[in-house]
């Protein structure tokens, strides 16, 4: 059963604009709370909410390497609450809820720096092998 207070919150987190920019490889989102984000495809790919990337619990995350030039070839809606992008490397199991995309946008700078730090610590590259 939906609570009375859930509806306004859900509406705020539903994007009013979703655009794929293939040339710059950026997903552009605007939300009803006034926030707008430009999320690079690589960023979305390395922070996929799938079990393949996140693991099944804390400490099981899999560092995603070689994703610098990844593109999104298709985006499928998932109900009225999410999208499922299909990436050029074949990854298609991440379901990105509006809430998750909003969270990625608000934390983008911090999350990106964390990713770069993990890559450096692992001696890994963003470039494809």
Feature-to-residue mapping (PLM):
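Motif-centric detector for short Cys/His coordination patterns
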Residues: 2-129
């Amino acid at each position: 059963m939906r609570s009375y207070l859930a509806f306004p919150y859900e509406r705020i987190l539903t994007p009013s604009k979703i655009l794929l920019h293939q040339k710059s490889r950026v997903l552009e989102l605007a939300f009803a709370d006034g926030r707008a984000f430009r999320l690079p495809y690589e960023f979305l790919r390395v922070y996929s909410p799938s079990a393949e990337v996140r693991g099944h619990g804390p400490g099981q995350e899999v560092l995603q390497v070689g994703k610098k030039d990844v593109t999104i070839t298709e985006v499928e809606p998932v109900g009225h609450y999410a999208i499922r992008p299909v990436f050029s490397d074949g990854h298609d199991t991440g379901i990105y809820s509006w809430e998750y995309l909003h969270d990625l946008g608000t934390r983008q700078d911090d999350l990106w720096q964390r990713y770069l730090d993990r890559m450096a610590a692992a001696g890994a590259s963003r470039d494809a092998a």
